[in-house]
From Swiss-Prot:
Keywords: Early protein. Induction: Expressed in the early phase of the viral replicative cycle. Belongs to the asfivirus DP238L family. It comes from African swine fever virus (isolate Tick/South Africa/Pretoriuskop Pr4/1996). Residues 190-233 are annotated as: Disordered. This is Uncharacterized protein DP238L. Residues 195-212 have a biased composition (Acidic residues).
Length: 233
């Protein structure tokens, strides 16, 4: 039974919290001016999370200390919210800072000014993401504008180059046409058509009567052969 009583003494009954599931720093252990702050600390308090100075003050509770942590020991009063704030992540620190400033603004405002929006001023060390995003957007716009200008200048140069090529090509074609006209003027017999008189004179000349008779005989014989071949079919 004695052993059981010792175990009962080492339970969480001496703690300031209402239940053993939600173990944290109670509001009674904090100063009065910090009661409006929200405590975001939950879980067991081990001996490594409490300073050695606070443990050395209370020598009577050393017997109830175990290896895993503090069981049956009251929380020291010298744990301040700043120490808790230093152990918090940066996101929770920003949230608590904004909540504190909103509470101060609401307490200092009059009844008529309660509906007015609250302006939260943060420390200069905190840089919002929106400003960084706007800077990136402006830089992207500048880059795109530079690219567009470069593209326009390139297209302009290319169009000018194409226009020069077209002019050169047309000039070369005109020169070729002029050369052909000059050749036609120099040799007019190339493009002139022969008349019937010219053809007769050309055909009838340079043949004797004997040659003409032989030619006519060969033509008549060839005509007879062609007719005979046609009749056979």
């Amino acid at each position: 039974m004695a052993h059981g009583r010792n175990i009962r003494k080492r339970t969480f009954s001496d703690m300031d919290t209402l239940s053993d599931k939600n173990i944290g720093i109670h509001t009674n252990s904090l100063p009065k001016n910090l009661l409006c702050r929200r405590i975001l600390f939950k879980g067991k308090i081990s001996k490594y999370s409490i300073f050695n100075d606070s443990l050395a003050k209370d020598h009577s509770s050393n017997r109830s200390m175990s290896i895993d942590g503090l069981i049956g020991k009251k929380r020291p009063h010298d744990i301040s919210f700043q120490n808790m704030n230093s152990s918090m992540p940066s996101s929770t620190q920003k949230k608590t800072r904004i909540l504190d400033e909103e509470i101060k603004d609401q307490s200092s405002s009059n009844e008529n000014d309660r509906d007015s929006p609250v302006i939260v001023t943060l420390k200069p060390s905190y840089m919002p993401k929106t400003s960084r995003i706007t800077e990136i957007i402006h830089k992207m716009k500048e880059l795109n504008m530079n690219r567009i200008e470069d593209g326009l200048s390139f297209n302009k140069k290319r169009s000018e180059h194409d226009a020069k090529n077209v002019l050169l090509h047309t000039m070369e074609m005109e020169e070729d046409c002029e050369i052909e006209e000059d050749i036609a003027i120099d040799s007019p017999y190339l493009n002139t058509s022969l008349s019937e008189d010219d053809t007769e004179s050309i055909v009838e000349t340079d043949y004797s009567e004997e040659e003409k008779e032989s030619i006519s005989e060969t033509e008549s014989s060839s005509d007879d052969e062609s007719y005979s071949l046609y009749d056979s079919f």
